[in-house]
Amino acid sequence: FALSTYENHFGPYMWNRVGYCMVPFNSGAMEHATNIAYPKATATGTLTYQTLYAHELSHHWFGDLATCRTAEDMWLNEGWAHFCEFLFTEALYGTNSYLAAVRLNHESNLQFNTPKEGALTLSNIPQSVTYGDHVYNKGADIAHTMRGYMGDSLFFYSVKTYLANNNYKDVSSTDFM
C-alpha cells in the first residue's frame, strides 16, 4: 500500500525489487536501494511499526533516488521521509487522521524540539544534530506547510519534478529551493 501511495505522489519506484530483512539491533532501521533492514523487535505481527516501515520505504525516493549532498542538509532525506509517514497515514486512514498527526508534529516541534536542540535552520545544521528531532519533525513541518500553501496538485507536481530532475544525484537545500 505504501509503495503505490509513493509511486502515485512521487513517480515510479526505480529499482527492480524491494527486499526486507530483520537484523539483531535494537533501534532504528536502515534502507539501502532494494533492501531495508529493520530491528528484529519490529516483527510483531501488528501495525505498531507501520510508519517505520513506510518511512524506510520512502527513502527510496528521498535518500536513494535523490540524496542530500552533505550531512548539514539531512532534512532532504529524513524530513521528507518523516513527511511520507504522514502521507501514508492519510492514504490509509483519511484526511482527518493526517491533519491530526500533522498538528501533533507541529506542536511537538515547537514545544519540545526547539528548546531541546535550539532554533536551528534546516540547512547547514551542526553535525551533532544531523539525526536530531529537528531534522525529522521540522523538515516534515516544512513539507506540510508547502503542501498547504501550494495545494496538492502543484505541490506533488513540484515534488515529482524535483525528483525527476535529480535522479541519482546529491542535492543541497539551495538546489531544492
Model-found features: residue ranges?
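Short, well-structured active-site flanking segments
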Residues: 14-16, 70, 74-78, 92-102, ...
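An active-site-proximal "capping" alpha-helix that borders the catalytic cofactor pocket
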Residues: 2, 6-7, 77-89, 176-177
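Sec-exported extracytoplasmic/periplasmic mature domains
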Residues: 7-11, 62-63, 85-93, 147-148, ...
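Active/binding-pocket-proximal capping segment
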Residues: 24, 75-82, 162-164
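Amphipathic alpha-helical substructures
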Residues: 132-177
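Juxtacatalytic substrate-recognition/specificity segment
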Residues: 1-73, 84, 125-130
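Acidic/His/Gly-enriched intrinsically disordered linker/tail segments
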Residues: 78-141, 145, 149-150
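Secretory-pathway/luminal and periplasmic proteins that interact with or process carbohydrate-rich
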Residues: 27-32, 67, 88-95, 166-172
